């Protein structure tokens, strides 16, 4: 959960305010760590909760309810003195599951292609592409303003698998 502190430190040093952090939620480990880091910054280091960016997980495998249960269990096991299962500090969207882990649709593939060709950002359809597409849609749907940070948590092997399976 030290990564959250690193993000906040980088933001301070570079005079950037992140209003939202988005990432894929699969096993729940990364979002659990970020949320634990946020709670630690608030309770131990005295950060105001209003200074902390909202953490948004885009589920790639589970329903939002099940993903949230897993994450809350993780949070409580990190440090029960700092965490409480009744408070979370994050939200989960399962609106982009496309039927579950490993499933995707043409919209996700179009997003992946656009990001690759316009920004040289490789995304895979199973994990990071689904999450990035979900982030774009959540920003549109909820009219989120400010700066959004997308945490690319991997998926490179899946990206290369996908690239090899595409027609030349």
Predicted features by range, described:
Residues 1-94, 98, 152-168:
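Glycine-rich phosphate/pyrophosphate-binding loop at beta-loop-alpha junctions
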Residues 88-145:
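Active-site-adjacent helical/loop segments in soluble small-molecule enzymes
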Residues 20, 146-147:
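Residues that mark the start of a beta-strand
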Residues 126-128, 151-154:
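Short, loop-centered acidic/histidine patches that primarily coordinate divalent metals
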């Amino acid at each position: 959960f030290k990564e959250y502190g690193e993000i906040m430190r980088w933001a301070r040093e570079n005079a950037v305010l992140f209003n939202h952090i988005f990432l894929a939620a699969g096993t729940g480990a990364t979002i659990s760590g970020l949320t634990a880091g946020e709670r630690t910054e608030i309770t131990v280091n005295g950060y105001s909760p209003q200074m902390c960016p909202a953490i948004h997980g885009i589920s790639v495998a589970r329903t939002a309810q099940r993903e949230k249960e897993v994450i809350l269990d993780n949070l409580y096991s990190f440090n029960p003195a700092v965490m409480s299962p009744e408070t979370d500090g994050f939200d989960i969207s399962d609106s982009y599951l496309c039927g579950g882990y490993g499933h995707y649709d043409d919209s996700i593939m179009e997003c992946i292609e656009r990001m690759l060709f316009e920004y040289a950002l490789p995304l895979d359809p199973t994990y990071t592409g689904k999450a990035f597409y979900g982030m774009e849609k959540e920003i549109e749907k909820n009219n989120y303003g400010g700066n959004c940070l997308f945490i690319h948590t991997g998926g490179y092997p899946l990206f290369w698998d996908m690239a090899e399976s595409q027609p030349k």
